[in-house]
A protein has these predicted regions:
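N-terminal leader segment of winged-helix/HTH proteins
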Residues: 1-25
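Short, locally clustered residues in the helix-turn-helix/winged-helix DNA-binding domain
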Residues: 8, 36-43, 103
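Short alpha-helical "packing" element that flanks the helix-turn-helix/winged-helix DNA-binding module
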Residues: 31-35
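Charged, amphipathic alpha-helical coiled-coil/dimerization segments
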Residues: 67-126
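C-terminal regulatory/oligomerization modules of transcriptional regulators
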Residues: 119-148
Length: 148
């Protein structure tokens, strides 16, 4: 019980400053993650399946998040150039501008000091990844081709 209670409280402590920082940008952390992932690619585009694998979340969650981003004009869905079954996500100029501003704010306000040194933070990420994997939350992503 101590583990569950401690992890739950740590999650609350880590998420609260992220949510409050993203609120003025009308972004949830899930929406931010999708935008940030797309902005990191060479041309701002990535197949939906690749995005899902890299985010390590359930495909339904990514679809729901992308639906809202498309509705708000921050992401476009495009046809895959070679696979008629696949969808490509593309960040819009508005999405790129928003995620850059949100990233600056997060780096300054929420991520600057989480209370752990770099080694402890890396250890914690590895431990949590093992827990999530054993619980079936994600599998190691397959080797993926470079995004378009």
């Amino acid at each position: 019980m101590v583990l569950v209670t401690s992890v739950n409280r740590a999650q609350q402590l880590l998420v609260a400053p992220v949510e409050s920082t993203l609120r003025p940008f009308a972004l949830s952390f899930a929406r931010f993650e999708v935008l940030r992932l797309l902005a990191f690619t060479r041309d701002g585009r990535m197949p939906m399946g690749s995005a899902t694998a890299r985010l390590q979340v359930h495909p339904t969650s990514v679809t729901s998040t992308v639906d809202r981003l498309v509705r708000d004009g921050l992401v476009r869905r495009e046809k895959h150039p070679t696979d008629g079954r696949a969808t490509v996500l593309a960040i819009t100029d508005a999405g790129r501008e928003l995620v850059e501003r949100a990233t600056e704010a997060l780096n300054a306000q929420a991520f600057a000091d989480v209370g752990l040194d770099e080694a402890d933070a890396a250890d914690l990420v590895r431990i949590i990844a093992r827990l999530r994997k054993r619980a079936g939350d994600f599998e190691d992503p397959p080797e993926l081709p470079e995004p378009l």
